[in-house]
């Protein structure tokens, strides 16, 4: 093999080894998904299209207690955005899960801690609220005005 090719191959291998040591930075939504599954027994997918407020957006009157959990979570994120540079959907944070307990760590009042507290409250609310299968996948245009 040509020495130049070996040098390129060596450089690629070293780069891959270095990249393997970089810890993956998960997005907040992945952390929220894990938190939901820590607090309760349902998968996070059970909430994506639930009611008027679970999932993207939200309008109208919440359909039930679980939908109110999602509305409150949306409002909590809106409050977190007041930090100026705080983007809740992408802000990562530190927490521990000891099923079903969740503990947020980090500086109280910081963007990360605030977002963690929002997600923690929502995950615990989801776990405690009754789940009405009839409210999953509803037509938001007709039910959420």
UniProtKB/Swiss-Prot annotation:
Propeptide: 20-27
Major localization listed first in the record, in broad terms: secreted
Reactions it catalyzes: a 1,2-diacyl-sn-glycero-3-phosphocholine + H2O = a 1-acyl-sn-glycero-3-phosphocholine + a fatty acid + H(+)
Pfam family membership, one: Phospholip_A2_1
GO biological process: arachidonate secretion; lipid catabolic process; phospholipid metabolic process
E.C. designation(s): 3.1.1.4
Cofactor comment text: Binds 1 Ca(2+) ion.
GO cellular component terms, semicolon-separated: extracellular region
Tissue-specific expression: Expressed by the venom gland.
Top-level taxon of origin: Eukaryota
InterPro entries in the cross-refs: PLipase_A2 (IPR001211), PLipase_A2_Asp_AS (IPR033112), PLipase_A2_dom (IPR016090), PLipase_A2_dom_sf (IPR036444), PLipase_A2_His_AS (IPR033113)
Disulfide bonds: 38-97, 52-144, 54-70, 69-125, 76-118, 86-111, 104-116
Swiss-Prot/TrEMBL keywords: Calcium, Disulfide bond, Hydrolase, Lipid degradation, Lipid metabolism, Metal-binding, Neurotoxin, Presynaptic neurotoxin, Secreted, Signal, Toxin
Signal sequence coordinates: 1-19
Binding, Ca(2+): 53, 55, 57, 74
Compartments it resides in: Secreted
Gene3D superfamilies: Phospholipase A2 domain
Cofactor(s) required for function per UniProt: Ca(2+)
Active-site residues from the entry: 73, 119
Gene Ontology molecular-function annotations: calcium ion binding; calcium-dependent phospholipase A2 activity; phospholipid binding; toxin activity
Task of the protein: Snake venom phospholipase A2 (PLA2) that inhibits neuromuscular transmission by blocking acetylcholine release from the nerve termini. PLA2 catalyzes the calcium-dependent hydrolysis of the 2-acyl groups in 3-sn-phosphoglycerides.
Alphabetical list of PANTHER family matching this protein: PHOSPHOLIPASE A2, PHOSPHOLIPASE A2 FAMILY MEMBER
Family membership noted in the UniProt record: Belongs to the phospholipase A2 family. Group I subfamily. D49 sub-subfamily.
Protein name listed in UniProt: Basic phospholipase A2 2
Source species: Bungarus fasciatus (Banded krait)
